[in-house]
Amino acid sequence: HWTPRDVVELMADLVFMPIADKIKDASYSCYDGACGTGGMLTVAQDRLLTLAKRRGKEVAIHLFGQEINPETYAICTADMLLKGDGEEAEHIMYGSTLSDDQHASRQFDFMLSNPPYGKSWKTDAEKMGGKKEILDTRFNTYLEGGDAMPMIPRTSDGQLLFLLNNVAKMKKDTVLGSRIAEVHNG
């Protein structure tokens, strides 16, 4: 599926505008776990660089993504190679974010995504040992007492898992924390 450019720009505004005056001379990271051709990542990069420049700040933004479709993965990687020095392309991974998270140990400053909705994740569930056996802590929420509560949805639609994946990748001990903009079908 494809996200209209005006929607992507709105998402970037929602992520960056509330903290625009808090941007420091620093390096930031941006992630999309369903990156397709990488449009959200490049719009986010452009928006942050523009906001920083207007405020006299020197920033670097490093892009990270993962894509399961081989054609869109190839387009995204090629686009990153053409637009940059190749470093960004190294952070775009191929495979399923749900069952084979290639950025498992990372946390990000900003996350924008339009995950597939209405799409079965049954194959991913099977790769993770079956829906009832999934132990991946990304897909838990934690109750007030610290107890984990699995948030595993029906296998006919895995979009909630992409949101939980992003929440699990949020920075917890930084001044800005992390910010997420994600499109869902309602």
Task: Describe every region a protein language model picked out.
Residues S96, P115, K119, T137, ...:
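Flexible, active-site-adjacent loop/turn segments at secondary-structure boundaries
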Residues T3-S113, G118-G129, H184-G186:
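Conserved S-adenosyl-L-methionine
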Residues H1, L112-S113, D147-P150:
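Compositionally biased, intrinsically disordered/low-complexity regions enriched for serine, proline
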Residues F110, K132-L135, T155:
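Short linear sequence motifs
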Residues K122-A148:
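A mobile, often basic/glycine-rich helix-loop segment
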Residues Y73, T77, G145-G186:
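Conserved Class I SAM-dependent methyltransferase catalytic core
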